Amino acid sequence: MYEGNFLHLQNKVFNTKHNLLEKTMINRELIRIKIVQLTYAYYQNGNRNMDNAEKELLFSLAKAYDLYNYLLALIVSVTQEERHRVEIAASRAVREGTEAPSSRFANNRFAVQLEENKQLNLFMETQKRRWEDDMEAVRKLCDQIEQSTIYQEYMGGEEDSYEADREVWRKIYRTLIQENPDLDAVLEEKSLYWNDDKEVVDTFVIKTIKRFDPANKEDQELLPEYRDEEDRDFAVKLFRATILNADDYQHYMSESSRNWDFSRLAYMDVIIMQIAIAEMLTFPNIPVTVTINEYVDLAKLYSTPRSGGYINGMLDTIARHLIQTGKMMKTMPEPRPRRPYNDRQADRTPRREGRRPTIAQTSAQRVAAREQTEDAGNNDQVE
């Protein structure tokens, strides 16, 4: 009873902290993704320089935050382009004596508030990149917006409020920016990192749009890069533990692989389990079940179709062994008794096909290929 209550309390405390992390751009989910990618690259590239690898990790995370601000700035650039179009159309209407065009979207109150945002403007002043250098992409996006049902319904809608202005941009982002191959290609040309980051960063841009409050005016807070130094340290500590204690972690895997030939495991499976074990042993406040679930999800995206189930079983076995031997001071729920095979088959529901993943779906092979093209001696200079 005591152990069960303690486990419940541990998960409750963790979930409270996790909700706080949702208010930062770089959260644990993104950090785990980056560490999977960079650990794979660390071993594949043969460049075993820990200092360079850590610089690459932090630089990669910083680039994700750059993308977050750059995508917010895209909303501003689209608004400015729309304003320019309305001005031209208004001048033509005066000359021809026709009805002046509506400036509702050009003067969208949410977009204007974002345009005046002190934090975004301060950040963009430090950047060399400007959407003004890619006006063809901005104009193409404007055309797509103007042709969309979302835009037409907004322009013809009766509700005239800040909430309606904010909501139309949330819909536009989800429909026309989040899934936009042309825009993705432009971003990939800007930075090698951004192609892998965009799917995760998109979710934070949408959260930011929903958080905007007209009462905050130009002082509306954007998501900070990190909540505090603890989050930044999480990335460095997890990556360092993964690499420096690799032999110990792989020994635990070998012991728990039972009838499997450890040398024949998918290489990405080994990487993912190695990082998961590092997290379990390095961070006492993260519940074991949370760690296992996070890395099972990563395995489904980055490794083989069967990796999720196998890694789930392996990590569960390893965690219980570490607890029983006193190497890890955490608790886990008692394993459920296995039901007869025929009963399990009868209850099984068909797997959903075509499920879209919720985090960046980048194959490990593509990650490695990209990293191998970069100059190992200038990892902190890559753009």
Predicted regions and their residues:
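Class I Rossmann-like S-adenosyl-L-methionine
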Residues: 8, 19-383
